Amino acid sequence: MQDLLGWLMLFERELLAFAAFWFCVGLIDEFAIDLTWLWLRLTGRARTAQLPVGYGAEPLSGQAAVLIPAFQEAAVVGTTIAHMLAAWPQPDLAIYVGCYRNDPATVAAASAAAESDVRVRVVVHGVAGPTTKADCLNRLYRAMAADEARSGRTFTSVILHDAEDMVHPAALQAIDAALVLRD
């Protein structure tokens, strides 16, 4: 028994030395990155990019869809939708909010926030929630695909968004511009 304990203590010490070595390598790596950034800032080679005034309000190059799965998000989903509509005024934006049939508070909050804006579509899932977020997103994707088939236009970008997060006014334009450069 004493022999086994000795081997375990030796193994523990070797494992600690191994972990300490790689921790120090990671520390040196992070410290080098921080020093490089500081040197670039002090020499004026690293600058913070400034977006031009009005960036983010330009028309999109194609349609953009935002998919928002929501279950028991009545307290936040209305604010998220209202903020998104105000921050992203582009008419080629479509917001799909996925709710569940057994969550009337979230359905009501999403519908109230959408008011009469045709860019927002509240999609009520046919099964009782909660299911997985992926299941709700799949339901939203099917609704989006049905809208594409009906209208004959395809979405150039599909953005997944959380019900409680706010958007930056320039984010949609930046995504659109990056996709145009990529394609």
Residue ranges and their predicted role:
Residues M1-E58:
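N-terminal membrane-anchoring/stem segments of glycan-assembly enzymes
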Residues A46-D183:
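Internal catalytic domains of large membrane-associated glycosyltransferases
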